[in-house]
């Protein structure tokens, strides 16, 4: 099975910051919803997956917060204009039949890695769509990261990572 897993938080942030603020006639913000849908439709059209899952972060602290007090301490909260769009986007995705996955104490990255490993164990291949370069360490012969950049989505397989960084994917954690 070819599984496409989207890092929802990463991609919705790219959509939000990549498109000027759009609103409905009654003033509701829609730019993140519009941009995320475009990203999703482009991925579906380009890759024709057998199954799709969208992973989301939860607000609950993770084990990383317990291990390191400063984990993401300098991150700013979600802009209010984006926060207002999140329930609408998630409901739209539910209404369209997309599986959405989140778990308290887990980040979307953790879910991406877990789903990729489970799908690989079942004999499948996985595409991980994200703008987070940390996910590149998950790449192997059965898992490709579709790395969202400012202009394009780059398919990052083991050969592409070796060429760009000069190391194998598991070694990226040391770079």
Each predicted region: which residue ranges?
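NTP-dependent nucleotidyl-transfer catalytic core
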Residues: 3, 47, 58, 70, ...
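Conserved nucleotide-binding/hydrolysis micro-motifs of P-loop NTPases
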Residues: 10-11, 59-62, 133-135, 151-152
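Extended two-metal-dependent nuclease catalytic cores across DNA- and RNA-processing enzymes
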Residues: 22-23, 73-175
């Amino acid at each position: 099975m070819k599984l496409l897993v989207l890092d929802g938080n990463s991609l919705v942030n790219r959509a939000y910051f990549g498109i000027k603020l759009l609103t409905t006639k009654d003033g509701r913000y829609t730019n993140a919803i519009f941009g995320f849908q475009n990203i999703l439709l482009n991925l579906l059209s380009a890759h024709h997956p057998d199954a799709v899952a969208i992973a989301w972060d939860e607000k609950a602290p993770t084990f990383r917060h317990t291990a390191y007090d400063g984990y993401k301490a300098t991150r700013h909260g979600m802009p209010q204009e984006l926060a207002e769009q999140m329930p609408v986007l998630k409901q739209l995705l539910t209404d369209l039949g997309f599986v959405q996955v989140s778990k308290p104490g887990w980040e979307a990255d953790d879910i991406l890695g877990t789903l990729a490993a489970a799908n690989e164990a079942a004999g499948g291949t996985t595409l991980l769509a994200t703008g987070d370069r940390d996910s590149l360490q998950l790449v192997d012969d059965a898992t490709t990261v579709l790395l969202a950049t400012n202009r394009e989505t780059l398919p990052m397989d083991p050969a592409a990572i070796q060429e760009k960084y000069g190391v194998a994917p598991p070694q990226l954690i040391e770079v």
